């Protein structure tokens, strides 16, 4: 799922940059537990909020997505009309619609709010799927927009960021303290960054779990919008058109990994299909 990968990558980068800038400026988290928690919340939520605000721009730039302003082909006109019709059913402002060139069957939705969003599809998706299946994929992405998944993800990421920063500083303070009560600032900064990365990885498991639950919900939303058979057909098509991607890129695809994993942004295709059949 592109929006999750881009959000997490941007969030981590911003979090690291903020910490470095604050350290260079001499703004630290020394003080009582209350001030440390407040400092951690500012750092944690700033990163996730900036990631959210930049998500649409970063998504466009990263894949070279071309927004359809005026349809040039019948296919582009159909895409716009389909997204517009689905947005009306959700009572949403029509998202921007974009196409990007990639042989990989893929699609994603992103944006800072329910009424300022982007839905993009790859040329590979359009080439490999029928109109009914593409309609189901669009409905899945529209469900993410309608459910406000990006904003909810921002809040969750902000909370876990806060505890990542808070706990890493607590541990760094204990390790960097000398016998005479003084503290090595270099050791403090290094230890806090190491534990921030470690705790950040553990915190990502929480975000990934949340992402998998939202995928089930988006599948259900798509089924409600266009019917479960179309969504099941789209997922089965993804199973029949595997794409050889580096392991670190699996989270970028609409299907995610084919197996269940703690680090997967998506449930397995088989589990998603089974869940849809049980509706």
Curated annotation (Swiss-Prot):
GO terms for cellular component: plasma membrane. It is a multi-pass membrane protein. It is found in: Cell inner membrane. One of its GO terms (molecular function) is metalloendopeptidase activity. The keyword Ion transport does not apply. Binds 1 zinc ion per subunit. The keyword Hydrolase applies. One of its GO terms (biological process) is proteolysis. The active site is at 141. Its cofactor is Zn(2+). It comes from the Bacteria. Coiled coil: none annotated. InterPro entries: HtpX_protease, Pept_M48_protease_HtpX, Peptidase_M48. CDD domains: M48B_HtpX_like. Zn(2+) binds at residues 140, 144, 215. The chain crosses the membrane at residues 4-24, 34-54, 155-175, 189-209. Its EC number is 3.4.24.-. Keywords: Cell inner membrane, Cell membrane, Hydrolase, Membrane, Metal-binding, Metalloprotease, Protease, Transmembrane, Transmembrane helix, Zinc. It is an enzyme of class 3 (hydrolase). HAMAP family: Pept_M48_protease_HtpX (MF_00188). Belongs to the peptidase M48B family. This is Protease HtpX homolog. It comes from Neisseria meningitidis serogroup A / serotype 4A (strain DSM 15465 / Z2491). The gene is htpX.
């Amino acid at each position: 799922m592109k929006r999750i990968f881009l959000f997490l990558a941007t969030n981590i980068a911003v979090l690291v940059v903020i910490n470095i800038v604050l350290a260079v400026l001499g703004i630290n988290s020394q003080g009582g537990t209350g001030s440390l928690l407040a400092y951690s919340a500012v750092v944690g939520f700033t990163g996730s909020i900036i990631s959210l605000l930049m998500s649409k721009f970063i998504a466009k730039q990263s894949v070279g997505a071309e927004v359809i302003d005026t349809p040039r082909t019948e296919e582009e006109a159909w895409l716009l009309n389909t997204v517009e019709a689905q947005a009306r059913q959700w009572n949403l402002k029509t998202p921007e619609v974009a196409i990007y060139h990639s042989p990989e069957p893929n699609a994603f939705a992103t944006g800072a709010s329910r009424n300022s969003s982007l839905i993009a599809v790859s040329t590979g998706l359009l080439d490999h799927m029928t109109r009914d299946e593409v309609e189901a994929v669009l409905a899945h992405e529209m469900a993410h927009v309608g459910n406000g998944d990006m904003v909810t993800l921002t809040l969750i990421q902000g909370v876990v960021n806060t505890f990542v920063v808070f706990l890493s500083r607590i541990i760094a303070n204990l390790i960097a303290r000398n016998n005479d009560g003084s503290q090595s600032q270099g050791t403090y900064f290094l230890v806090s960054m190491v534990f921030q990365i470690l705790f950040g990885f553990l915190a990502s498991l929480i975000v990934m779990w949340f992402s998998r639950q939202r995928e089930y919900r988006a599948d259900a939303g798509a089924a409600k919008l266009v019917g479960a058979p179309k969504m099941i057909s789209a997922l089965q098509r993804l199973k029949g058109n595997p794409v050889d991607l580096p392991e670190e890129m699996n989270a970028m695809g609409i299907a995610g990994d084919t197996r269940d994993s703690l680090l997967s942004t998506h449930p397995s295709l088989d589990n998603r299909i089974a869940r849809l059949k049980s509706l």
